[in-house]
Amino acid sequence: MLIIQKYGGTSVGSVERIKAVAQRVKQTVQNNNTVVVVVSAMGKTTDDLLSLSKAVSTNPSAREMDMLLSTGEQVSIALLSMALQELGQPAISLTGAQVGIITDAEHGRARILEIQPKRIQHYLNQGTVVVVAGFQGMSSGDNFEITTLGRGGSDISAVALGAALKANLCEIYTDVPGIFTTDPRIVPEAQLIPEITCDEMLELASLGAKVLHPRAVEIARNYGVPLVVRSSWNNAPGTRIISPIAKPRSLKGLEINKAVYGVELETNQVKVARWQGRDRLGVVAKLFGEIARDNLDVNLIIQSIQEDDAKDIALTVVNRGFEQGETLGAAVSETKLKELITSALYGATWQGSEEVEMMVEQNMATVAITGTGMIGRPGVAAKMFSTLAEAGVNIEMISTSELKITCVINAEVCDRAVAALCQAFEIDRSVVLGPDSIQEFSTDSSPSPVCGAVLDLNQACITIRHVRDQPGMAAKLFGQLAQENISVDMIIQSQRCQRLNGIPTCDIAFTVAQADAEAASMALKALALSIACGEIIVDTDIAKVSLVGGGMVAQPLVVAQFFEALAQQQITIQMITSSDTKISCVVAQEEGVKALNAVHKGSIPVVKNYAQTPKGLATPAKPTYAG
């Protein structure tokens, strides 16, 4: 069996740790395995090298930085190879260039184009352990420049080698026992997850879980590389990351594959939007409690905040049994929806006199592009929006995730939208989803779909007031950000239309990394005059708390528990977005840690049979979720 083992900086942070890793590698070989080891720089070596560069230059070139930083891994691979040889195990150390990792020429953030495994395969056939420098490669073309893959690059190197060599297993060894349901440094009750899907892991990684780089998960998902995240301090089994059965694909352009693999259309959607004055704490929790009790299928959820601090919430409901041309079925009738929202707003005190401001649009559809690494590729969303605009399709709601970008549109133009997207992204065919394709869940007995909760304190919210509500506006806004290579996470389009000089407008808000907030604001201000929008507001005092899990929004009881947990802690929700695999809320930054603890306690299942010890976890019985 061919096994790739990757060891992070803390795992090889001292001579003693390197010797311990050598013992583990030798034992793996003795268990009748062939082994490739990918190693990071020792301890804080990379940080020390960065400090040295700053000491001699205020603005070092990206090329020289790659030349400098790549030396850190060369020290650790040579030492580990020596340690293996000392144990009588044949081993050889090779740089990324020497094993044939070919990248593009983007110094500091290179992407792998291909791996030429001939040399590494030669040594493996001789029974030699190959110790590879992670984080680095060599540019294509005639220059043969040393390149680095960016922070977390050793994860990427290991999984890419696993794909190129068709490894049976790729083990990622770290200083933690595996993937936890949340950050155990913030939430002591965090539990180790025994098993997680690639889709779930990709969302967790993109939301800030730092155990595994999102690009590494993306490669594993695309090529079906089996992954395990384990502690280098003990023999506990860690967390298995389950990859889907991979479709045959070329190893050329390994990290430069098409971002979009498919187009999905889902009809039979009803859009429900309501708005209110000042926020009433717990209203969203009550609303989804009512939805759960009536077992309605909710597809997307958004909430935004208006200029006058009023809030609106919109959601799409799947209309089961609805046939084109018929009126709404009883399950999602306009009257029923209004009753649900009224009950959530006013409860038992409602006397029938209060008017609920609500809009129900029956003939709606969702169109989505699917792939991997969507948020990390800022041009993808912009291209989708511009394609729809050119086809004359107006976007009413937007949902983003690492796996899918979804837009709510009028069903009358859905065929036009699908055709345009298939042509723009070179997709051969689209998938039409219907009510029968939606998994049914019992609110009483099915296990929680939630696998983890993540807190991100490094986001900023940018709000653009009074954007014209017409096709093409989202394309212009996010196209401008894509030109600046700024990735956008949450996107919320207000559902309350305001007319200025007779022109319908709405507010659009989105989140970016705090480090990109100033550049994003400047880029949009340069565009503001040409699109005649209003004020641009930047808020860095926010936190984003998210739940991740497959099919989560299809279980409204879980969504209700999420919102109820926040309401019980008196935490005000500023914004909400959802997708198939996650639901995210923006709250005040000072309430971020409290929010994470609340939603983890209220929404995460318990993992049994793991006992914490000072140096990690004792070898457990097979872990299970508590019922």
Report each predicted region and the residues it spans:
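Nucleotide/pyrophosphate-binding catalytic subdomain
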Residues: 1-218, 316-318, 408, 587-591, ...
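Solvent-exposed alpha-helices and their adjacent loops that cap or buttress functional pockets
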Residues: 27-32, 60-61, 113, 121-130, ...
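Hydrophobic anchor at the start of a short beta-strand
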Residues: 35, 89-92, 170, 227, ...
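YjeF_N-associated NAD(P)HX repair module
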Residues: 79, 164, 211-212, 221-255
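Short, structured patches in soluble enzyme cores that scaffold and shape functional sites
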Residues: 135, 174, 205-208, 221, ...
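Phosphate/diphosphate-binding loops
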Residues: 199-233, 367, 418
